[in-house]
Amino acid sequence: MSVKQIAFGSKVGESLLNGVIKLANCVQVTLGPNGRNVLIEQSFGDPRVTKDGVTVAKHVELEDRYENLAAQLVKSVASKTADMVGDGTTTATVLARSIYSEAFKGTSAGMNSMELRAGIDHAVEIVVEKLKELSIPVKGDYQKISQVATVSANGDTEIGDMIAQAMEKVGSDGVITVEEAKSFKTELDVVPGMQFDRGYISPYFITRQDKGIAELERSYILLYDGKISSAQSLLPVLEKCAKESASLLIIAEDVEGEALRMLVVNKLRGVLKVAAVKSPGFGDRRKAMLGDIAVLTNGYVVSSEVGMRLEDVRIEDLGRADTIVIEKDNTTVIVNGPARSSVKERCDKIRSEIQEATSDYDKEKLQERLAKLSGGVAVIRVGGATEVELKERKDRVEDAMHATKAAVEEGIIPGGGTAFLRCVKPLEEVIKSAKVQERGRDFICGIDAVRKALSSPCYQIASNAGKEGGVVVAEVLKASDVNVGYDARHDQYVDMIKSGIIDPTKVARTALQNAGSVAGLLNTTEVIIAQVPEKEKPNMGGGMGGGMGGGMDF
């Protein structure tokens, strides 16, 4: 077992706070319409330029091991916020820094950290309820949807309009994906495709570590209605795909044992681009959904019920897809070109089954299948003059897309940190209440930490615009209209809703809840146990070189 470094007492809090501050200082410059770029050195390829908070956070590694632990913890919260709603990572980081900074002052003054944490949790609950009161529904209002997307894309109206058009074409519950274009132009296209709620069986199938996804281009698809555990049964189809230098997606009830090990080894060694996901649905519905995917991709379901064996699968039996994106919990299959007549026939068959269905549950599941098969996939192809510009623009499109979906779910609130400022007064009233006063100063200090932190997003947006943050916050707080806030782009105070400066309620709520959670955890941490860095062993030289690995691993 490796030796550990251990820290106790005041050193713990100071190190953790320094780590959080350093991370927040890197991320906060990207906040708002006047957010600045961050230039990131990469281990290979060109440097990366981005305004995406979670991308910046992912690249922060601090030299001090104790400080780095705090930074990693806040990074995980930023990533969790991104995973849940796709945006709000910078806001979550800034709020976490502010809440923890205020709470740390109380702990340093001898207050009970557990009571402080209880106060933080109580304040977060109150603010969440207030945000829900301020929220305005937007489902079906494509002008508001465009405004949400524009704000999240750092004010790029072209991106905002394109996402609104995509949502209008495939519906608010439809599938929208983002790809890199082969030209300078950014274009929208609706193509046949489907998304289902199953992700990769093993994280070793991931091809893009920065996004945590597996991407396959021009891929074959093997559809099997049982479990696959034998490596031998898969060998023939794998060899056929490798011979054609094609990638392969396996969709089966499960892939396990030696079959899974063989797939992972060959993927890691670069022998074959392959991934495996579990079949969507259960029982008869699983078979039906496999049939839907087969029709969409022009393949066949390999089934023992009709006498088919994996060993006998021909390349013609496999489905084909132009793009496959596999996330932790979802898989999207895209087939470019017009929908085939077989897809339309399958949709007609499902419609007739809906009419014949007697139970509401069966009708609902059939409606889901019909929507997945007939809705198609909206593909936004992002263009750029250089690879650096393309990646930066693609980051913004993905952020905007996720923020838009969040807005449809829970509505919108005044943007620019305005909604958080409208929650300051309710917290002040709570602090004055007899019930809270009875809990004592430690509990009140926790509530006050959140109250003070609520001004930090607006303060930072103003600072990034070259203004005095404290003055801007005071002006917004003075306004009697709850929708009035600071328009950093035009340097004026406006009705944020009417001006289209809006944030999804879900993004703000999630950012605050995650920030409050991590601040409470950090403030109740008394001991740090960290790895002692290993000393580099001297290079003795003169050793024999290793032999070349060879051959296929099938």
Curated annotation (Swiss-Prot):
Its EC number is 5.6.1.7. Its main location: cytoplasm. It comes from the Bacteria. It is an enzyme of class 5 (isomerase). One of its GO terms (molecular function) is ATP-dependent protein folding chaperone. It catalyses: ATP + H2O + a folded polypeptide = ADP + phosphate + an unfolded polypeptide. Keywords: ATP-binding, Chaperone, Cytoplasm, Isomerase, Nucleotide-binding. It is found in: Cytoplasm. PROSITE patterns: CHAPERONINS_CPN60. Belongs to the chaperonin (HSP60) family. This is Chaperonin GroEL. It comes from Holospora obtusa.
